[in-house]
Amino acid sequence: MRGDRGRGRGGRFGSRGGPGGGFRPFVPHIPFDFYLCEMAFPRVKPAPDETSFSEALLKRNQDLAPNSAEQASILSLVTKINNVIDNLIVAPGTFEVQIEEVRQVGSYKKGTMTTGHNVADLVVILKILPTLEAVAALGNKVVESLRAQDPSEVLTMLTNETGFEISSSDATVKILITTVPPNLRKLDPELHLDIKVLQSALAAIRHARWFEENASQSTVKVLIRLLKDLRIRFPGFEPLTPWILDLLGHYAVMNNPTRQPLALNVAYRRCLQILAAGLFLPGSVGITDPCESGNFRVHTVMTLEQQDMVCYTAQTLVRILSHGGFRKILGQEGDASYLASEISTWDGVIVTPSEKAYEKPPEKKEGEEEEENTEEPPQGEEEESMETQE
């Protein structure tokens, strides 16, 4: 596992080699995943009792889930805004910003929100070209309609590079603007929202639809919430985007020979194990984005240093988990971010953190020939996660 880390794998299309300097096709390898080949490793003793670990996971999820007040406030604001926009679609009157549809996306739609971050995402698809003036006009129209309905409620509206957001005292709804796909070819960078922003909003709709159809199993949602928390508390996991965490959670629970969901404690451990085995390293088959064409592997949005950092952080946490340190990893015993970089002891067992295996090569001087020895993200593929970073 560690032996392959940091080696150049020959770029996107393989490395130069062989007679005539042709290209070897890039063949990704499959990292070791115990749960895909469990039959090959029959148990010689009973499985350990993990009741306390399972209970700790459920308790942590309970602590992370939005409380009833947060849920009520975000539901109320989303419903009001949704209704106002629906009315503008059905009966725009003299309002010139024509709307195709509005869709709920992100963690609110997926049911993976966390407490303390009461933010929901809506995508509004315009029929017209998305000018900055149109976005501001729509934001003002929506907030004015809301104030007319309930003058006592204090609301603020702010425009931003992705659209606008409307906030009450205890909830925020981000409205992400995009346009119908044929309009993407007519954009003027001087007048309209950035095409990357528009494409990201369309991708968020695809992600929400895929999640609803494939990942609505409750164990998947709980695991994703726990992974989001892990990402926040361990800097080594920061490069993992919300969309990568969604796919990783679904993979860990559902991708096994029986096609039956694994138990939460098994799936949580499996996440760390497959990350430690190099699921998101260069040359790995990784996880293919189900919402993009061309077998796009989601981990290629990360730099090589980030891919390595995710791997060595997971390796350290797997060792701590195997020696009973789950409460520390789950954040139930104070700050644990130091565990990924400092030596720790668990029941007399010393765990030494894994070190990075990839060193970024020095900058090449002008005129030097570029070596094709790194695997780069495919050109033209944008980061597939536009949802609120949580």
Curated annotation (Swiss-Prot):
Keyword line: Activator, Cytoplasm, DNA-binding, Isopeptide bond, Methylation, Nucleus, Phosphoprotein, Transcription, Transcription regulation, Ubl conjugation
A GO MF label: DNA binding
InterPro entries named among the record's database cross-references: DZF_dom, DZF_dom_C, DZF_dom_N, ILF2, NT_sf
SMART domains (UniProt xref): DZF
Cross-link (Glycyl lysine isopeptide (Lys-Gly) (interchain with G-Cter in ubiquitin)): K45
Domain DZF intervals: 24-371
Stretches with biased composition (Basic and acidic residues): 356-367
Tissue specificity note: Expressed in brain, kidney and ovary; highly expressed in testis, particularly within pachytene cells.
SUPFAM superfamilies linked to this entry: Nucleotidyltransferase
Description of how the protein assembles with itself and partners: Forms heterodimers with ILF3. ILF2-ILF3 heterodimers may also bind to PRKDC/XRCC7: this may stabilize the interaction of PRKDC/XRCC7 and the heterodimeric complex of G22P1/KU70 and XRCC5/KU80. Forms a complex with ILF3, YLPM1, KHDRBS1, RBMX, NCOA5 and PPP1CA. Identified in a IGF2BP1-dependent mRNP granule complex containing untranslated mRNAs. Interacts with IGF2BP1. Interacts with CRBN; this interaction promotes ubiquitination and subsequent degradation of ILF2.
Protein name (Swiss-Prot/TrEMBL): Interleukin enhancer-binding factor 2
Organism name: Mus musculus (Mouse)
